[in-house]
Amino acid sequence: MSWDQVWIDINIATMSPNISEPYGAITDAALAVQDGKIAWVGKRSDLPEFDVFATPIYKGKGGWITPGLIDAHTHLVFAGNRANEFELRLNGASYEEIARSGGGIISTVNACREADEAELFELGRQRLNALAKEGVTTVEIKSGYGLDIETELKILRVARELGKHHHVDVKTTFLGAHAIPPEYKDSPGSTERSDAYVDLVINEMLPKVIAENLADAVDVFCENIAFNLEQTERVLSAAKDAGLDIKLHAEQLSNMGGSAMAARLGAKSVDHIEYLDEDGVKALSESGTCATILPGAFYFLRETQHPPIDLLRKYKVPMVVASDYNPGSSPLCSSLLMLNMACTLLRLTPEEALAGMTRNAAKALGIEDQVGVIEVGMTADFCMWNISTPAELAYTYGVASCVDVVKNGHLVHQ
């Protein structure tokens, strides 16, 4: 017998719920890869005999293998930056005040409308490289910085191209309903103009996105500075009817009931959720919808309202941890930093945080049958870390500990 690869002198955090040990751990382990899949995993003492002359053997020097990390919420393709708004916030301006004065998302929209695809691709490639160096093997990229047909399609095309030219898998999300463009700004007491923009998203943008196969999912920002509950449901329902997965930015600044509505529609995830209440948590539990925690935005905006972690535990809602990398509220292109922040700021355990970037993140993207755990038959996406315990991934930051990355059975970083 021979395999494409065999890994020995390792410990494995499989993250499998089928193994009762913390992290689904197998110590003194071995792992075999064949045809891009995990062909065998278990104790090294149980490893079947194989042709050592025909099989490449990799020695982990006692380190740990984990599933490849999955960043399930990013806005990675954009132009420009918002360093000036950073200074405004430090001088007392709120996120909402900046947004209402024409800053925030709209300032990035203007930069993206001016940028061409080549510029956006190069910027996205650099950011994707940064995540890949930290063991990320799958990433979600949203649009939402165009807010017109041409630019929304441009951003999604760039995201698709990044996936074709990089070893990191890219899942794309259409977020045309990210903010209300200035040209559709409502008069006081009216939603006529923003309703017209929602019509544009549903009737013109979405069909073009589908025609070019540019999105795996559709997202909406449901908040008092963006889209109301009725508008949000219209967009999500249209996406669901078109056969796309749905997800939602919800309960970041207030409790509008978006999470419960999205759960009723079968959303894969609701994200941010600082103001999520117990009824909303129950709705997520009943629908199997994931709750995505975004500690980078919580930190950068200096928020004080914590996501309801204890309630999510109580009702066994899968918790996802993601970077929310974007120029305004989380300009932090580091998944490992998010693991640390999830623990130190939001009180997740290191095991919960790692599950949030592996097993649960895969569920949020609808790819839990392919990646996120190390089990026989799963895609061979995994990382080799120079650590003594998986908790180190959340405990320390700034020390390069990712030694190797295997993607689809191929060693891509060594």
Swiss-Prot record:
SUPFAM superfamilies: Composite domain of metallo-dependent hydrolases, Metallo-dependent hydrolases. GO terms for biological process: L-histidine catabolic process to glutamate and formamide; L-histidine catabolic process to glutamate and formate. It is found in: Cytoplasm. GO terms for cellular component: cytoplasm. Pathway: Amino-acid degradation; L-histidine degradation into L-glutamate; N-formimidoyl-L-glutamate from L-histidine: step 3/3. Coiled coil: none annotated. Its EC number is 3.5.2.7. N-formimidoyl-L-glutamate binds at Y145, N326, G328. InterPro entries: Amidohydro-rel (IPR006680), HutI (IPR005920), Metal-dep_hydrolase_composite (IPR011059), Metal_Hydrolase (IPR032466). Fe(3+) binds at H73, H75, H249, D324. Pfam families: Amidohydro_1 (PF01979). The keyword Iron applies. One of its GO terms (molecular function) is zinc ion binding. Its cofactor is Zn(2+); Fe(3+). Keywords: Cytoplasm, Histidine metabolism, Hydrolase, Iron, Metal-binding, Zinc. 4-imidazolone-5-propanoate binds at R82, Y145, H178, Q252, S329. Binds 1 zinc or iron ion per subunit. Zn(2+) binds at H73, H75, H249, D324. Belongs to the metallo-dependent hydrolases superfamily. HutI family. HAMAP family: HutI. Catalyzes the hydrolytic cleavage of the carbon-nitrogen bond in imidazolone-5-propanoate to yield N-formimidoyl-L-glutamate. It is the third step in the universal histidine degradation pathway. This is Imidazolonepropionase. It comes from Shewanella pealeana (strain ATCC 700345 / ANG-SQ1).
